[in-house]
């Protein structure tokens, strides 16, 4: 049976704006890929959105962030500006294990909040169409 897996997350942008300067750089490098950091160009609003998308992806995978490395979930923009979720290493393994065949991500912001949803089409091996 074909199904959907969905994850949603909401992040306060102030959490990123108010990061302790002593840990900020280490935290950002642990959570985001070099490409994500470059693309965000220091925008805490954009980084909060990417963070929410990573959390939403982990929830859709059914494992939470503890089972996958932050940097194995990469959120970058397509040429037309849409966010794209790329899965690497353990995250890709988990997606394949759960039967993910395609997925999408959506990110939205207000002045204070960043929200993301990830939806995946799940087709377990041997599923009937």
Predicted segments with their positions:
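Core catalytic alpha/beta fold that binds nucleotide/phospho-ligands
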Residues: 1-129
